[in-house]
A protein has these predicted regions:
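C-terminal, well-structured catalytic/ligand-binding subdomain of enzymes
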Residues: 1-77, 104, 110-179
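Intrinsically disordered, low-complexity linker/loop segments enriched in Gly/Pro
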Residues: 71-99
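Short, surface-exposed recognition loops or helix-turn segments adjacent to catalytic cores
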Residues: 90-95, 103-111
Length: 179
């Protein structure tokens, strides 16, 4: 399960069906600039690849005039068009032009049982595999607006993360969620 709370200044959003280059997909898009801008904020494609993001605020030192995470929506749109698996998404991130202008945590699941969280900056990423007990000892991975690989005590969403983790950990311990 991927779950996202879209806290954005863009109040008009809708779910669109998009005929992609390789795979068709449904995605949450900003109504005001769709389809002119090929941006999506979460979605699922025709082969069961699903992707969402949270803006991270502690991976990149943003320069004056730069928009934080300027490429995040374009990356989601493009990945939904061309990726089928978590491994495909790794390859996608490995081969995009750098600096990527990405600063985000991407949650990814696929129809083959793959599930991972990627903390992505302009040049590199850190992957956390939800199927690996060292990355997800309780069977889940949660993120808000900071990245574990980023600068400590910077970012946002620490209180939300602690609450989400508390709820998920209890549910996991009581059998309320299953990995």
């Amino acid at each position: 399960l991927l779950w996202k709370n879209r806290d954005t200044d863009y109040l008009r959003n809708h779910v669109a069906y998009i005929k992609g280059e390789k795979y068709n997909f449904i995605a949450d898009v900003n109504s005001a600039n769709f389809p002119a801008l090929k941006e999506a904020w979460m979605g699922t494609n025709s082969v069961g690849f699903a992707l969402m993001n949270t803006q991270s605020y502690n991976l990149v030192e943003v320069k004056d005039g730069e928009e934080r995470g300027a490429a995040n929506g374009r990356i989601i749109y493009r990945a939904l068009e061309v990726c089928a698996t978590v491994e495909d998404f790794c390859h996608f991130l490995d081969t995009i032009t750098k600096p990527s202008l990405i600063e985000a945590n991407f949650g990814v699941i696929d129809a083959k049982g793959g599930a991972a969280m990627f903390e992505v900056d302009y040049y590199k990423y850190t992957m956390y595999d939800a199927n690996d007990p060292k990355d997800a000892p309780y069977g889940y991975i949660a993120r808000t607006n900071f990245s574990f690989a980023g600068e400590v005590n910077r970012g946002a969403g620490y209180v939300r993360y602690m609450e989400a983790d508390r709820v998920l950990m209890r549910a996991s311990a009581m059998g309320g969620i299953t990995p």
